[in-house]
From Swiss-Prot:
One GO term describing the cellular component: cytosol
Active site: K46, Y275
Gene Ontology terms: biological process: D-alanine biosynthetic process; peptidoglycan biosynthetic process
Keyword annotations: Isomerase, Pyridoxal phosphate
Residues that coordinate or bind substrate: R144, M323
Lineage: Bacteria, Bacillati, Actinomycetota, Actinomycetes, Mycobacteriales
EC number(s) on file: 5.1.1.1
Pathway: Amino-acid biosynthesis; D-alanine biosynthesis; D-alanine from L-alanine: step 1/1
Species for this entry: Mycolicibacterium vanbaalenii (strain DSM 7251 / JCM 13017 / BCRC 16820 / KCTC 9966 / NRRL B-24157 / PYR-1)
Essential cofactor(s): pyridoxal 5'-phosphate
Name this protein carries in UniProt: Alanine racemase
């Protein structure tokens, strides 16, 4: 097992941990590959691998057959390169003033969303003497990041000229679904049609794309007709279902967040707990203190609403969640919880523990937000995994 501290290199024992199962990552990539059919799989490892650790997830995904990697920013791509990941990686979100030279020097593919970005990329190619591998990010209806229909022809013409000059290699055309988590929504087909038309327009103007990709996790699992040349799953790589109402798709959640109990103490009926005394013991009972709080990603909005699992049994949080700690009620009578026992905040759910999806439903959010939230003093650890391509 390897350990990666999120904030500090010198760590005391018994800190909260996010344990990442790399075998689950490999399993999930295998599931996605099966659904993708002949299409390749790009494993998206942006946002530090959705909170799971980009480098470790990248290696596990590649070993399981992912063809390449996707990230949001050039900085994320360069971090993978610094860690020795040599596989193809595409970055697609660039603030104004981004210098693409480091990306080109590190053999990072760049997706551009405007003629301005493409001009900046050409400038970097000229300064470095490197040929840029470029993908066009197209807006087909999400109205977010991507070149729109009106500006697309000018960008295609600029691509053709730059490719003719040897400044760029045209690699791909990509877009992103607005209703991917609603597979039957008619707008999914509208976006696919628009993307196809954009590829045809480019061909008519002398530009051809090696790969076209549109599908995110839910589409990769439910809409094989939208696979094009490659699918681009994110959350499914980490085992979280992208469409909870349709089940888990055979995915295995890779993250378990747990924290050792730091104190066990009895209280009497009438004693109140934590800030504001929002919970009062109705009987004599025993409490356990768990040293993780909202600074570590335990949402304060979960106060008095969620449970943890200790030694295979669930216990409710009582009182407000604090910055560094929260309290659970072990109930009256003898208890089988001691200091040092792990309180599982969420995990795969296979042993009855709460899941990230449970938290998402309590918070009226999505499991994406839950798994990207552990931070602060939470230490990332890894189990499973094996060597493979980087």
């Amino acid at each position: 097992m390897t350990t990666t501290p999120t904030m500090t290199q010198k760590l005391p024992q018994a800190l909260p941990t996010a344990s990442i199962d790399l075998d689950a990552i490999a399993h999930n990539v295998a599931v996605l590959r099966e659904h993708a059919g002949p299409a390749a799989v790009m494993a998206v490892v942006k946002a530090d691998g959705y909170g799971h650790g980009a480098t470790q997830v990248a290696r596990a995904a590649l070993a399981a057959g992912a063809a390449e990697l996707g990230v949001a920013t050039v900085g994320e791509a360069l971090a993978l390169r610094r860690d020795g990941v040599t596989a193809r990686v595409l970055a697609w979100l660039h603030p104004p003033g981004t210098d693409f030279a480091p990306a080109l020097l590190a053999d990072v593919d760049v997706a551009v969303s405007s003629l301005r970005q493409f001009t900046d990329l050409l400038d970097a190619a000229g300064r470095t003497g490197r040929t840029a591998d470029v993908t066009v990010k197209a807006d087909t209806g999400l109205s977010r990041n991507g070149v729109g229909e009106a500006d697309y022809p000018a960008l295609v013409d600029a691509l053709r000229r730059a490719a003719s000059d040897g400044a760029v290699r045209v690699r791909g055309l990509m877009s992103h679904l607005a209703h991917g988590d609603d597979p039957e929504h008619p707008f999914n087909d509208v976006q696919a049609r628009r993307l196809t038309e954009m590829a045809k327009l480019a061909g008519a103007r002398g530009v051809s794309y090696d790969v076209v990709h549109l599908s995110n996790s839910p589409a990769a699992l439910t809409r094989p007709d939208l696979a094009f040349d490659m699918v681009r799953p994110g959350i499914a790589v980490y085992g979280q279902t992208p469409i909870p109402q349709r089940g888990d798709f055979g995915l295995r959640p890779a993250m378990t967040v747990k924290c050792p109990v730091s104190a066990v103490r009895p209280v009497r009926a009438g004693d109140a707990v934590s800030y504001g005394h929002t919970w009062t013991a109705q009987t004599d009972t025993t409490l356990a203190l768990v040293p993780a709080g909202y600074a570590d990603g335990v949402f304060r909005a979960l106060s008095n609403r969620f449970e943890v699992s200790i030694n295979g049994r669930r216990y409710p949080n009582v009182g407000r969640i604090c910055m560094d700690q929260f309290v659970v009620d072990l109930g009256p009578g003898p208890v089988d919880v001691a200091e040092g026992d792990d309180a599982i905040l969420f995990g795969p759910g296979t042993d009855g523990e709460p899941t990230a999806q449970d938290w998402a439903e309590l918070l009226d959010t999505i499991n994406y937000e839950v798994v990207t939230s552990p931070r602060g003093r939470i230490v990332r650890t890894y189990v499973g995994g094996k060597g493979g391509p980087q």
